[in-house]
Amino acid sequence: MSRIGNKPIPLPAGVKYTHAGGKVVVEGPKGKIEQVIPEGIKLETKDGHIHAIRETEKHAAVHGLTRALVFNAVEGVTKGWSKDLDIVGIGYRAELKGKDMVVFTLGYSHPIEFPLPTGITAVIDPKQTRVTVSGIDRQKVGQVAADMRSLRKPDPYKNKGVRYVGEKLKKKAGKAGSK
């Protein structure tokens, strides 16, 4: 039994929603998202809410997934999604080059140029140590943030590197010296 799948999705004013042939198109003030829906799930609109209804018990596994995908699309076109990254380390920083390129200086012998995909924007604070990745597609925002983090993952000994804001890191003890 899917509890998430049974929750109705509120459809805010100004959001257009169409469902045809296994695809859902959600259009709102921030843009337009097309989302592929798994087979066996019907979407119905009642009283300003979208309901995900499974046709048989075999489709219980994708019931909650379908509801979450549609909810993420509706939230994306109304509020948008964002992920914050902290850059920790002496000399580590990021800067914007044009509108679609972030250049990272992360202690390597060369700066790393990171191209931003379409639909994704990055904002860098004045100290150049915090990057905010935002867009309307939740999956794409999370993937870009994960790719940026993988350029220099946090070091377990000094905790230097690129990390998510609020990420808890375990610091390892160094090797015990001889006494």
UniProtKB/Swiss-Prot annotation:
This is Large ribosomal subunit protein uL6. NCBIfam families: L6_bact. Part of the 50S ribosomal subunit. One of its GO terms (molecular function) is structural constituent of ribosome. Belongs to the universal ribosomal protein uL6 family. The lineage of its organism: Bacteria, Pseudomonadati, Acidobacteriota, Terriglobia, Terriglobales. Keywords: Ribonucleoprotein, Ribosomal protein, RNA-binding, rRNA-binding. It comes from Acidobacterium capsulatum (strain ATCC 51196 / DSM 11244 / BCRC 80197 / JCM 7670 / NBRC 15755 / NCIMB 13165 / 161). GO terms for cellular component: cytosolic large ribosomal subunit. This protein binds to the 23S rRNA, and is important in its secondary structure. It is located near the subunit interface in the base of the L7/L12 stalk, and near the tRNA binding site of the peptidyltransferase center. GO terms for biological process: cytoplasmic translation. InterPro entries: Ribosomal_uL6-like, Ribosomal_uL6-like_a/b-dom_sf, Ribosomal_uL6_a/b-dom, Ribosomal_uL6_bac-type. Disulfide bonds: none annotated.
